[in-house]
């Protein structure tokens, strides 16, 4: 890294081949236009070729008519020669150690970026920047190598550095395309696996910390931080059937049950230093497991490259690189492909709200606040000590737009769950008065971030109609999951954080007190159809001292398991798509630890295994019963039978599908008391079969049931002309369906 000052002045024999000031600037790594000096240049009577090879004692030009020794133009390793005509050539360098190497001259190749690309990049409207910027393996004029292109408009010099040039920034300085602030170079002879960074000199002459590639497809395994050249290229995907049905599978009328996964801690290999599974190992083990449990999708905590494992991926540096902790980009593609083949969709958490201040990342990228706001009242997130993207800059939002499309196109992911949307929407998010700047209307809305989110959603759904976007938005911001043309933000779904907090609080209460908190289970129906909601029991609820979901259930061990089963029964029969964090499907008892495997040994306990059986059956019921998913996000899909029996802590409700005669009756008894002869009204006469009972012995319960089902009686009740008398088991949710 860096450069030598060398001795000033030209070698006598080269005085006519290069100006002294140019030679000195090249040798010091301070020339602003290296392509104007290096490589071939037509002059009167022929061509002057110049190359900087500080590792070389002698350099020869190899042309069709033989080889010609170059003159040393500067003692630090600048060589030059004048040849007749304009021959095609290569270089042969004799190193100081006596070894030799043949190489193509990077400075004889044409520009990397076409004029249209430069125009679109300057506008900030190039939606496929990932195909042009970063490191792209190419063949140019019959020569294999790598195109490098980088946005750094305020830099005075940018170079590609790596093992291939001794990390010497003088070796491969790049060409500046002034109209777009893009630096570019084609380096022949490089290929997949080359390790590199960018050496950037700020406009004031400061040498900045080496930077990883913002568009890098791959990176070294942390704690190393360099980028790695990786050619994604074309893949023979085997998920054509899935992709053809993607739109139907992600539709709001479809069953969507999501298993949330942290790749590094789902399962580990204790025999091999307790390492996490690789992408390829996960492809089979996770795929089979999730398919067996009946989840329709997995959601991965952020898989973007990130330096700090304890951030769980929520502080990414390499947005275009799946983390190398578990394998290569192609192996992550294999994971997605295999999951699709097993009928499982893939959602990734997408972090577009902030980025960390690691010196090799986007922070102060070209010596200026390029990606972030300069004013800390706009550009610094105090809670996380991270930096906030400048959504008002077209090149920055173009970077994020392209990244969203990149994961959908290059990795076939089915959806993006956008993290921390509330922090993006509000200028005063987690800030005291005086710590934020109002918008142009004097309000606290981040108008630029709102425009970004709307545009991002419109692009995703226009380019990939079968995909989905999901917002983690924790406030009452209206119309998050409504179309942009109607004034919404354009997301497909929104996490229902209010439902999660209310229901967790209720089921964490001792049953004797639940009558006083009855509204915690009913309140969500007042706003349940304002958005397309996902009901989340996510990783956020099993960290930071909160314990596990099971650990928050009250009572003795039997009651805790019963409460958890009843809660899951309630969740799966309420309107909204489902999300459950890994480990909670078998009643993990300890808080989640990102450095350890889930407690799989608990499955040796029949009670934990019973909870897993329940999740499997709930997913099956949810998928196969249209009444449980077709109208998840519409008022017509739900009706209370009785929501007022707070004294007994009993709730009864109907779920409905498109077919008005296809409905389910659900009854929840959330006290440890058996409720015999409990009468509820039903809309139609007939035999009501008990489809599911969370108190079944199959799930670890006491097996108090209704003998398979009950007949209606012509006793009007709850506003219906018929009713059924049930035996409600303690701390349980039961589901009934009329036989037709």
UniProtKB/Swiss-Prot annotation:
Q: Does the keyword Secreted apply?
A: no
What superkingdom does the record give? Bacteria
Gene Ontology cellular component terms for the protein in this record: cytosol
Q: Which residues form the signal peptide?
A: none
One biological process term from GO is:
glycogen biosynthetic process
S-S pairs: none
InterPro entries, per this entry? A-amylase/branching_C, Branching_enzy, GlgB, GlgB_N, GlgB_N_E_set_prok, Glyco_hydro_13_cat_dom, Glyco_hydro_13_N, Glyco_hydro_b
Show the catalytic activity.
Answer: Transfers a segment of a (1->4)-alpha-D-glucan chain to a primary hydroxy group in a similar glucan chain
Keyword annotations for this protein, in alphabetical order, are: Carbohydrate metabolism, Glycogen biosynthesis, Glycogen metabolism, Glycosyltransferase, Transferase
Enzyme active site: 419 (nucleophile), 472 (proton donor)
For this protein, the record's HAMAP family field holds:
GlgB
Q: What does this protein do?
A: Catalyzes the formation of the alpha-1,6-glucosidic linkages in glycogen by scission of a 1,4-alpha-linked oligosaccharide from growing alpha-1,4-glucan chains and the subsequent attachment of the oligosaccharide to the alpha-1,6 position.
**What family does the database annotate?**
Belongs to the glycosyl hydrolase 13 family. GlgB subfamily.
The protein's assembly and partners: Monomer.
Can you say what this protein is called?
A: 1,4-alpha-glucan branching enzyme GlgB
* Species of the source: Paramagnetospirillum magneticum (strain ATCC 700264 / AMB-1) (Magnetospirillum magneticum)
Question: Could you tell me the gene encoding this protein?
Answer: glgB
């Amino acid at each position: 890294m860096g450069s030598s000052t060398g001795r000033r002045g030209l070698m006598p024999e080269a005085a006519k081949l290069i100006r002294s000031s140019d030679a000195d600037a090249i040798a010091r790594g301070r020339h602003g236009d290296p392509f104007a000096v290096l490589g071939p240049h037509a002059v009167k009577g022929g061509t002057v070729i110049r190359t900087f090879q500080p590792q070389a004692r002698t350099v020869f030009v190899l042309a069709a008519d033989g080889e010609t020794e170059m003159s040393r133009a500067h003692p630090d390793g600048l060589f030059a020669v004048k040849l007749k005509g304009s021959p095609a050539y290569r270089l042969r360098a004799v190193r100081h150690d006596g070894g030799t190497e043949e190489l193509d001259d990077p400075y004889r190749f044409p520009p990397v970026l076409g004029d249209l690309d430069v125009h679109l990049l300057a506008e900030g409207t190039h939606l496929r920047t990932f195909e042009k910027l970063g490191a792209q393996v190419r063949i140019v004029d019959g020569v294999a190598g790598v195109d490098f292109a980088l946005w750094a408009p305020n830099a005075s010099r940018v170079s590609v550095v790596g093992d291939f040039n001794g990390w010497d920034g003088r070796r491969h300085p790049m060409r500046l395309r002034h109209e777009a602030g893009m630096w570019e170079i084609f380096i022949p002879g490089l290929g997949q696996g080359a390790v590199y960074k960018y050496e950037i000199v700020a406009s004031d002459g400061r040498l900045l910390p080496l930077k990883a590639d913002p568009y890098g497809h791959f990176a070294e395994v942390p704690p190393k931080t360099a980028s790695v050249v990786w050619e994604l290229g074309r893949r023979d995907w085997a998920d054509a059937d899935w992709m053809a049905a993607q739109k139907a599978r992600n539709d709001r009328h479809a069953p969507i049950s999501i298993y949330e996964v942290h790749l590094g801690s789902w399962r580990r290999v204790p025999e091999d230093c307790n390492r996490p599974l690789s992408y390829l190992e996960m492809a089979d083990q996770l795929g089979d497991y999730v398919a067996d449990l009946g989840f329709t999708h997995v959601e991965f905590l952020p898989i973007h490259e990130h330096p700090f494992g304890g951030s769980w991926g929520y502080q990414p540096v390499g947005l275009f690189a799946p983390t190398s902790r578990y394998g290569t980009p192609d192996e992550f593609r294999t994971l997605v492909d295999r999951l699709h083949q097993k009928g499982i969709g893939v959602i990734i958490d997408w972090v577009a709200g902030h980025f960390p201040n690691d010196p090799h990342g986007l922070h102060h990228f070209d010596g200026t606040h390029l990606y972030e706001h300069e004013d800390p009242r706009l550009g610094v997130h105090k809670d996380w000590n991270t930096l906030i993207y400048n959504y008002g800059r077209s090149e920055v939002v173009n970077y994020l737009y392209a990244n969203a499309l990149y994961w959908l196109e290059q990795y076939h992911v089915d959806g993006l769950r956008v993290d921390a949307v509330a922090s993006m929407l509000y200028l005063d998010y987690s800030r005291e008065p005086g710590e934020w700047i109002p918008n142009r209307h004097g309000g606290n809305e981040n108008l630029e971030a709102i425009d970004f989110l709307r545009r991002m959603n419109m692009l995703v759904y226009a380019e990939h109609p079968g995909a989905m976007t999901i917002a983690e938005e924790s406030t009452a911001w209206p119309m998050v999951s409504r179309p942009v043309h109607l004034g919404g933000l354009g997301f497909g779904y929104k996490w229902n954080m209010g439902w999660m907090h209310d229901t967790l609080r209720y089921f964490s209460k001792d049953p004797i007190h639940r009558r006083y908190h009855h509204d915690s289970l009913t309140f969500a129906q007042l706003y349940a159809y304002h958005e397309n909601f996902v009901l989340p029991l996510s990783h956020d609820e099993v960290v930071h001292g909160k314990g596990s979901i099971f650990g928050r259930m009250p009572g003795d061990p039997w009651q805790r398991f019963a409460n958890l089963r009843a809660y899951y029964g309630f969740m799966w029969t309420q309107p909204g798509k489902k999300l459950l964090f890994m480990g909670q499907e078998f009643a993990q008892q300890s808080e989640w630890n990102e450095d350890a495997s889930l407690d799989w040994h608990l499955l040796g306990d029949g009670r934990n295994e019973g909870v897993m059986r329940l999740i499997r059956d709930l997913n099956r019921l949810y998928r196969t019963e249209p009444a449980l998913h077709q109208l998840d996000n519409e008022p017509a899909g739900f009706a209370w039978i009785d929501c007022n029996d707070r004294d007994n802590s009993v709730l009864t409700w109907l779920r409905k599908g498109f077919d008005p005669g296809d409905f389910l009756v659900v009854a929840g008894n959330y006290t440890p008391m058996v409720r015999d002869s409990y009468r509820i009204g039903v809309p139609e006469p007939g035999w009501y079969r008990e489809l599911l009972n969370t108190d079944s012995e199959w799930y670890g319960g006491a097996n108090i049931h209704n003998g398979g089902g009950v007949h209606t009686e012509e006793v009007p009740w709850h506003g219906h002309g018929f009713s059924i008398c049930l035996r409600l088991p303690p701390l349980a949710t039961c589901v009934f369906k009329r036989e037709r």
